[in-house]
Amino acid sequence: MAGVATRAAWPAPTTAAPVLTFTLPAGAKRAVVSGGPPPQLLKLADVRPGMVGEALTVFRGTKPEPFKVRVVAVLKQFLPKEDVILIRAEDPRVEHSGIVAGMSGSPVYVDGKLMGAIAYAWSFAKDPLGGVTPIESMLAERARPRRLDPMELAASAGDTGARGLPALVGARPVGGALGGEGRLVQAAVPLSVSGFTARTVAELTEALGPVGLVPMQAGGGRRLTPGKLEAGHVEPGSAIGVELVRGDMSMVGTGTVTYIDGATVLAFGHPMFGIGESYLPLVDAEIHAFLPSLAQSFKMSSPLHEIGVLVQDRQTCIIGNLDGRTTMMPVDVRVTGPEGKTRAFHAEVARNRRLTPMLASMVVANAVADAEPDVTDMVASVDGKLALHGHAPLELKDQIFSTEGISGRLLGGTHGLRALAELMFNPFEPVVVDRVDVDVRIELK
């Protein structure tokens, strides 16, 4: 059945929906910062092979622990106009696991001076060699001014070119998550997901693997608990995450804090997506375990508290603000099975024109896969309702037939979810989608 756009009487147009604030909301608590004032810096020009120092990272829990490292060499022009410091870890824990996905951003100190952040590694490496982004390169990004209206970043107009996650692949400076044998590549960012089915995780891996994100199922996603505003904790070496989905489902990319100065936090030592100025929630995280692997060891983690907002996603680091908060887009899904029983799911997804359509599609697909997992002939009737900021809402209807259950790809092709992407990329004016409601009715054939 062809999808027909209709102006619905649901709900009233929204006239005020703040996307970003750099003043803590009433009742919110600022993250507790420890570790003292910013350390002295070791200039790249003073780095020499053979120097011995220590790095900080969380092996388990929330407390950073030191491990010994030794400088091997300085790799000139590793990236355009950027050098990388080659190090070797000399600690039994890291010699067993190698440089771990999730260790990105771990600060490295020599004689008490901050040299930089662990950011690069080899897949299938036999020795724990890694690359360090010099702190000078990271601090240079801190001076970059914010230029764009956050509302427009959430839904920018004028870009009708490549869209969504495939367009992000070109933004990565070096190889993906597991490729790159024989060359130094960005340490992957473990994407901790909970509340997702194995089928949806497989689709996430296919979509996000090329951009250096490794989806892995973990427990303890951060649920939405109104009125519970606990303070998080952050210090150099602690785990920090970029939250993409929260609620009944959770998706968080986890790395490590490198440097804190007032409300400014530098982390990762490389980009997450490489999309420049952007506004996504930051959380602190708990590390459950290191999972060693020949291909790519990684940290298993869960998010704890919202602590700030990502403001820059650049070549040498991500930059956050501890006083900032940003909103996410609610997605409510109701799935009614053949027997008439309805299951409801609530999640919130990050506001970013390249991310939001994919994340919303995954939330809807996961809800359907969880509520009706049968891989058989079925018809899904989909009613999608988009509440638009300052405009009348939009309602679209679809019917899908599949012989192998309802997948994320099929749902992503429905008119409602396609309209979400088209609205965010429309060339006429920025459109902010306040929320998405999807009703799915399943019939077996």
Where do the language-model regions lie?
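Sec-dependent N-terminal signal peptides
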Residues: 1-8
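Terminal presequence/propeptide segments associated with secretion/organelle targeting
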Residues: 8-445
